[in-house]
């Protein structure tokens, strides 16, 4: 299931971030790719230990921790520090599946990649191509969001980034280990959480709200990996 999260950053904030990233020194993106991915990865990346990457990564995590939809959809237990990439001049990333486990640089911390995320910083009309294409149950789905918007998708997904033939596509990408490993279980919990919130708005104080909230937490208790 693909989940779009609007306006993690406003358009103005995304533009400021993009301007700072445009002035940074980029390196070959294959430095963080696995053996198979490196054969189809053609882009540039901000070094993981670059001060700007660390500063913006912290800012992204702060925003996401306050975003109700993100927290409900991802149920994050661990989040890999955000990375930043850039595509232009025909650069692309062919079909691949992300590594199942990532080690946080400079630590022994391991993150199981239950979910992947891309946060766009370039406006769609400033570049051609660059669509994130994610294969799911219903076939390939193409994603190209406004600057400041984010997409979540299962880490198990086969996916690619189409060649950028005009302009530049700058984005952040990262992975999460969820409290709930299985995508279908997370989706069910998200649907229930959204329904409870709507019921709270439409019929505040209804006794069913307490019952449904209890069911939600009992399912989470059954499925959570803590």
Curated annotation (Swiss-Prot):
This enzyme's EC code(s): 1.14.11.-
Root EC class: oxidoreductase
Positions of 2-oxoglutarate binding: 169
Keyword Oxidoreductase set for record: yes
Cofactor: Fe(2+); L-ascorbate
Signal peptide: none
Keywords: Dioxygenase, Iron, Metal-binding, Oxidoreductase, Vitamin C
Pfam families linked to this entry: 2OG-FeII_Oxy_3 (PF13640), PKHD_C (PF18331)
GO molecular function: 2-oxoglutarate-dependent dioxygenase activity; iron ion binding; L-ascorbic acid binding
Residues at which Fe cation binds: 96, 98, 159
Cofactor remark from the record: Binds 1 Fe(2+) ion per subunit.
Biological process according to GO: DNA damage response; intracellular iron ion homeostasis
Domain Fe2OG dioxygenase: 78-178
Name by which UniProt lists this protein: PKHD-type hydroxylase Bpet2704
Organism: Bordetella petrii (strain ATCC BAA-461 / DSM 12804 / CCUG 43448)
Lineage: Bacteria, Pseudomonadati, Pseudomonadota, Betaproteobacteria, Burkholderiales
